[in-house]
C-alpha cells in the first residue's frame, strides 16, 4: 500500500462529493495566476447574498524546489496577515516542517504554529504545536495503513489545562474505486461515510452521523456526474429534505463557471431557497 493519508484526509473522497461544486448563498470570484519565475498568486472574493457581507483574500506562494522550500504570504479583509515557511524532504525523506504565523494589526493578536509531518509506506504521522497566549496546545495524529485498511488516532493536549481536550479515532478501508470511513470523536460523536466510483463518469457518496444522547441521525446521499470533459452535474439530499444541486462548466481553458441551488424539499413553494454563482479564472 502507498503512503496513507493524513488523519484530516480520511474520508475525503466522500466529503468532496458532498461539498465540491456548491456555493449556496454566495457570489464568488477566484483568480489564480503563475508568473514565469514560479511565483503563484491566488485571490478570492465572495459576497453573501443574505447578509451582503463581502470578504476577500490574497495569497502569494513561491516554491524553491532546489531546497524543498515553500514561502507563502496571506492577507484577508479582516486585515489579518499570515506568513508560512515550509521545508520538505530535506532533513529526512518524508519529513515536512512548517512554521506558520499570523498577525492582526487592528487587534494586535498574534499567533504562531509549528507543524511537523512524517510519511512513509504504511504510516503518516503529524504533530502541531500552537503557541497561544493562554498556553501552548499540542495536536498529534497517527494513521496506519495495511492492504487497504486504515486506522487513525488524533488528540489535542492543552498545556494550560494539563489534560487531553480532544480524542478522536477512525477506521476505514480504501481502494481506487471504493472507500469506507468510520470515526468516533470524544466518545460522543459518531460518523461514517461510503464512497463509490461507479464508473469513469459517476461518483456516489453516503454519510451519516449521530451524537450520543440524541436520537436524531443525520443522513445524506450525494452524486457527481461528469457529463463531458468540460461539464459536470452534482446533486445531494439529506434527511431534513434539503436538496442541493450544482452545475460546473468550463467555458474555455482557464475559465470555469459554477451554478448551485439549495432547495427546501418540505417547503418548495414557500421560497427561502439559496442560489450560488462562482467564477474561477486560472492563467
Curated annotation (Swiss-Prot):
Positions bearing N6-acetyllysine: 20, 109, 252, 266
First and last residue of the signal peptide: none
Top-rank taxon, per record: Eukaryota
Description of post-translational modifications: Phosphorylation at Ser-193 by NEK1 promotes the closed conformational state preventing excessive mitochondrial membrane permeability and subsequent apoptotic cell death after injury. Phosphorylation by the AKT-GSK3B axis stabilizes the protein probably by preventing ubiquitin-mediated proteasomal degradation.
Keyword Transmembrane included in the entry's annotation: yes
Phosphothreonine carried by residues: 19, 107
Cross-link annotation Glycyl lysine isopeptide (Lys-Gly) (interchain with G-Cter in ubiquitin), location: 12, 20, 53, 61, 109-110, 161, 266, 274
Residues that bind NAD(+): 242-244, 260-264
Record's keyword terms, sorted: Acetylation, Apoptosis, ATP-binding, Cell membrane, Ion transport, Isopeptide bond, Lipid transport, Lipid-binding, Membrane, Mitochondrion, Mitochondrion outer membrane, NAD, Nucleotide-binding, Phosphoprotein, Porin, Transmembrane, Transmembrane beta strand, Transport, Ubl conjugation
Catalyses which reaction(s): chloride(in) = chloride(out); K(+)(in) = K(+)(out); ATP(in) = ATP(out); Ca(2+)(in) = Ca(2+)(out)
Site (Involved in ceramide and phosphatidylcholine binding. Critical for channel structural stability and gating): 73
Transmembrane annotation, as ranges: 26-35, 39-47, 54-64, 69-76, 80-89, 95-104, 111-120, 123-130, 137-145, 150-158, 163-175, 178-185, 189-198, 202-211, 218-227, 231-238, 242-251, 254-263, 273-282
N6-succinyllysine carried by residues: 20
GO cellular component: membrane; membrane raft; mitochondrial outer membrane; mitochondrial permeability transition pore complex; mitochondrion; plasma membrane
N-acetylalanine found at: 2
Family annotation (InterPro entries): Porin_dom_sf, Porin_Euk, Porin_Euk/Tom40
GO molecular function: ATP binding; oxysterol binding; porin activity; voltage-gated channel activity; voltage-gated monoatomic anion channel activity; voltage-gated monoatomic ion channel activity
Binding site for ATP: 12, 20
The family this protein is said to belong to: Belongs to the eukaryotic mitochondrial porin family.
Role of this protein: Non-selective voltage-gated ion channel that mediates the transport of anions and cations through the mitochondrion outer membrane and plasma membrane. The channel at the outer mitochondrial membrane allows diffusion of small hydrophilic molecules; in the plasma membrane it is involved in cell volume regulation and apoptosis. It adopts an open conformation at low or zero membrane potential and a closed conformation at potentials above 30-40 mV. The open state has a weak anion selectivity whereas the closed state is cation-selective. Catalyzes the scrambling of phospholipids across the outer mitochondrial membrane; the mechanism is unrelated to channel activity and is capable of translocating both anionic and zwitterionic phospholipids.
Protein name, per record: Non-selective voltage-gated ion channel VDAC1
Protein's organism: Bos taurus
Gene expressing this chain: VDAC1
Amino acid at each position: 500500500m502507498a503512503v496513507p493519508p493524513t488523519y484530516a484526509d480520511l474520508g475525503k473522497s466522500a466529503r468532496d462529493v458532498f461539498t465540491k461544486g456548491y456555493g449556496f448563498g454566495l457570489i464568488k470570484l477566484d483568480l489564480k495566476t503563475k508568473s514565469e519565475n514560479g511565483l503563484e498568486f491566488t485571490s478570492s472574493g465572495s459576497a453573501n447574498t443574505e447578509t451582503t457581507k463581502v470578504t476577500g483574500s490574497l495569497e502569494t506562494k513561491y516554491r524553491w524546489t532546489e531546497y524543498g522550500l515553500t514561502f507563502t504570504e496571506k492577507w484577508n479583509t479582516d486585515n489579518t496577515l499570515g506568513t508560512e515557511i515550509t521545508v520538505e524532504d530535506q532533513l529526512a525523506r518524508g519529513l515536512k516542517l512548517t512554521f506558520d504565523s499570523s498577525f492582526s494589526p487592528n487587534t494586535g493578536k498574534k499567533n504562531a504554529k509549528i507543524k511537523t509531518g512524517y510519511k512513509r509506506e504504511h504510516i503518516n504521522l503529524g504533530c502541531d504545536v500552537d503557541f497561544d497566549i493562554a498556553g501552548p496546545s499540542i495536536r498529534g495524529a497517527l494513521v496506519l495503513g495495511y492492504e487497504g485498511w486504515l486506522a487513525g488516532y488524533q488528540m489535542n493536549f492543552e498545556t494550560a489545562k494539563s489534560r487531553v481536550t480532544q480524542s478522536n479515532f477512525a477506521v476505514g478501508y480504501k481502494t481506487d474505486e471504493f472507500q469506507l470511513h468510520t470515526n468516533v470523536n470524544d466518545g460522543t460523536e459518531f460518523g461514517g461515510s461510503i464512497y463509490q466510483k461507479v464508473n469513469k463518469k459517476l461518483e456516489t457518496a453516503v454519510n451519516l452521523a449521530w451524537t450520543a444522547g440524541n436520537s436524531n441521525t443525520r443522513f445524506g446521499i450525494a452524486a457527481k456526474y461528469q457529463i463531458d470533459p468540460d461539464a459536470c452535474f452534482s446533486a445531494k439530499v439529506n434527511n431534513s429534505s434539503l436538496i442541493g444541486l450544482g452545475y460546473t462548466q468550463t467555458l474555455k481553458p482557464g475559465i470555469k463557471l459554477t451554478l448551485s441551488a439549495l432547495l427546501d424539499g418540505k417547503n418548495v413553494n414557500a421560497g427561502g431557497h439559496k442560489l450560488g454563482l462562482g467564477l474561477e479564472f486560472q492563467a
